[in-house]
Design a protein with these regions (language model features):
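Alpha/beta-hydrolase active-site loop
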Residues: 147, 157, 174-192
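Long, low-complexity repeat tracts used as extracellular stalks/passenger repeats
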Residues: 507-584
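N-terminal cap/lid subdomain of alpha/beta-hydrolase-fold enzymes
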Residues: 30-34, 69, 76-173
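A catalytic-pocket lid/entrance helix-loop region that shapes and gates access to the active site
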Residues: 121-125, 219-312
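Alpha/beta-hydrolase fold catalytic core
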Residues: 297-444, 456
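Catalytic histidine neighborhood in serine/cysteine hydrolases
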Residues: 458-473
Length: 584
């Protein structure tokens, strides 16, 4: 069953929309360029009825695909027409039923990867890490769908998918850490109001750059009186300044356990590990005790590595001693090209590889090139044919312009460190549940670096940390996805002991080079226009990690205090007078 509906907005906003309604005017196009905007907001949506069987139980649900206007905190000013797809189980009590907002990162990525790859009602079968699945991938009912735990809302950032600014704003006005999080806050608030879900338990689910967005957004929502019940951090990069791929002077200690996991997958570690989890625990300990102080000496004083250390690194990672001797602070680029000579291994999922010079290697990441065309084709067809949304042909899965134009600055740093934002959200809402999910074979957001970042929070009773075999998009792995679903189910239910017994690693004394770090070079191959987007990716000219060590303890508490003093959070400066939103 299909129908067209108009979400109900409260009070003065609803009256403004009705007053400006233009009757039978045609739907606008949704341009995604930097200067693009709509003259007025547009909020028509398609509604379709479906049923999904999960665990033997039939769940009838309604899918809504369309646009909803983010309204500024003044309650009058339209900012952006967000495209979203919501899945709502029928017949549930909205006061008890959770609602979860999903988004990817980039920055400049739509939500297509989470939408059609993870825990929605329908899922593309990729077969990764194998690359033998015929393309385009089949779209199937998803037995790991989260509709048995929560209603689901997939949201595209402004300038991606079909989301676009409303004049006088342009898309570019929302392409920055703070402006992006603020307009997401305003969308969440608009969605909850339009659907009368203000009392529903609120959850956020961000992936990659979506994790720093989640940290900032959670803090802003708490300040706005809409505290989330929980946040999910999939493949985190919470502090860009501590990620060794962002600058030549930033320690790559966070990558070493991932290198070990990748070496084990290819049978290069000596001796071959029996239990991967136990082995990686040993590698973490070795990294903290031996590698980290050595690489700091290498970075600050040029102290050459001890041959015994190089031998141990070769044994636990399979990476040739020559690479470690050449640069002890070994970034993932040389590992991806040098681990298996003549072969390029994936950045998103290092278990995926392709011969150098092959079509699969031509865009710089075979694990991304393999899946991107199918996702790009599937989302348009799915929106049009399954969800009855007629204007999906212009759906943009990623925006290189957004990534190139992005303002990465945040809290006085050129690159964002959002651990203080997450800490501020926890301070405002001590019951906030946080679930961190990482893949062992992800060379974009390494799992041990996530641990080091989260360790700055200290022991947190409501923080769960989980690792799986898999890459950046763990959920594409058919073995790991059911495990991830089980962990998410326990998270939503707040089952006793759901957080587990994760012990934060000890923080190193210093993680970065004293002078400003030299920007890391370009990736081996720059993504082609319309091709796979590196996520997280920072253009080389903007890779200026802070020389200051990450805050923890008293210094972190002081940062949190300053954030809480700014209770309202950042708003988006309005460029000039503009019309009220128009509903047609």
């Amino acid at each position: 069953m299909r129908s067209w509906t108009r979400p109900v907005l409260p009070g003065s906003v609803l009256l403004a929309l009705i007053a400006c309604s233009g009757g039978g005017a045609p739907a606008p196009k949704y341009p995604t360029g930097p200067e693009a905007s709509l003259a007025t907001a547009w909020e028509d949506a398609s509604r379709t009825a479906h049923t999904l069987v999960l665990g033997g139980t039939a769940i009838p649900y309604t899918a809504t695909a369309g646009h909803l206007t983010a309204i500024a905190p003044d309650g009058r000013t339209p900012e952006a027409a967000f495209f979203y797809v919501a899945y709502t189980a029928d017949g549930q009590d909205p006061a008890r039923r959770p609602v979860t907002f999903f988004y990817n990162g980039g920055p400049g990525s739509s939500s297509v990867w989470l939408h059609l790859g993870s825990f929605g009602p329908r899922r593309l079968v990729t077969g990764e890490p194998a690359t033998t699945e015929p393309t385009p991938f089949p779209l199937v009912d998803n037995p790991e769908c989260l509709l048995d735990a929560s209603d689901l809302v997939y949201v595209d950032a402004v300038g991606t998918g079909l989301s676009v600014a409303v004049a006088p704003y342009a898309n570019r006005d929302f392409w920055g850490v703070d402006a992006d999080a603020a307009v997401f806050r305003d969308f969440v608030r608009a969605y909850l109001a339009a659907n009368r879900r203000e009392a529903s338990p609120l959850y956020l689910f961000g992936e990659s750059y979506g994790t720093p967005r989640t940290a900032v957004l959670a803090n802003l929502l708490c300040a706005a009186g809409l505290p989330p019940a929980g946040v999910v951090l999939q493949s985190s990069v919470l502090d860009y300044n501590a990620n060794g791929d962002m600058g030549n002077g930033v320690s790559c200690a966070g990558f070493v356990p991932t290198y070990a996991a990748v070496g084990a997958f290819y049978g290069l570690d000596t001796p071959p590990p029996g239990d991967l989890t136990a082995f990686l625990g040993q590698v973490r300990a070795f990294t903290a005790a031996s590698y980290t102080p050595a690489v700091q000496a290498w970075l600050t004083a040029g102290t050459p590595p001890d041959p015994f250390l190089v031998g141990r690194l070769n044994a636990v990672t399979g990476i040739a001693p020559a690479l470690w001797t050449q640069d002890l602070n070994l970034q993932p680029g040389p590992v991806r090209t040098g681990l298996l000579p003549g072969t390029l291994i994936g950045r998103y999922d290092a278990r995926v590889s392709a011969p150098a010079g092959s079509a699969l290697a031509s865009e710089g990441d075979p694990s991304s090139t393999f899946i991107t065309p199918s996702f790009k084709t599937a989302i348009t067809r799915y929106l049009q044919h399954d969800l009855g949304y007629p204007d999906a042909a212009g759906y943009r899965i990623s925006s290189e312009a957004a990534n190139e134009s992005w303002d990465f600055s945040h809290d006085g740093k050129q690159l964002p460190d959002t651990i203080p934002d997450l800490a501020a959200a926890i301070e405002q809402n001590p019951g906030l549940k946080v679930l961190s999910l990482n893949g062992y074979h992800d060379l974009a957001t390494p799992f041990y670096q996530t641990e080091l970042d989260l360790a700055r929070l200290g022991a947190q009773p409501n923080l769960g940390v989980r690792f799986y075999a898999g890459g950046h998009m763990v959920y594409l792995d058919d073995t790991s996805r059911p495990l991830e679903k089980a962990d998410l189910a326990a998270f939503y239910q707040a089952a006793p002991g759901w957080a587990g017994a994760w012990t934060p690693p000890a923080l190193p004394v210093r993680w970065t080079l004293a002078p400003p770090a030299v920007p890391a070079p370009e990736p081996m191959v720059q993504a082609a226009p319309g091709g796979p987007l590196y996520d997280p990716y920072v253009p080389p000219g903007k890779r200026r990690p802070s020389a200051a060590p990450p805050s923890s303890g008293a210094a972190l508490r002081e940062q949190v205090r300053r954030k809480l003093d700014a209770v309202a959070g950042p708003n988006i400066p309005r460029p000039g007078p503009g019309p009220a939103p128009d509903r047609r």
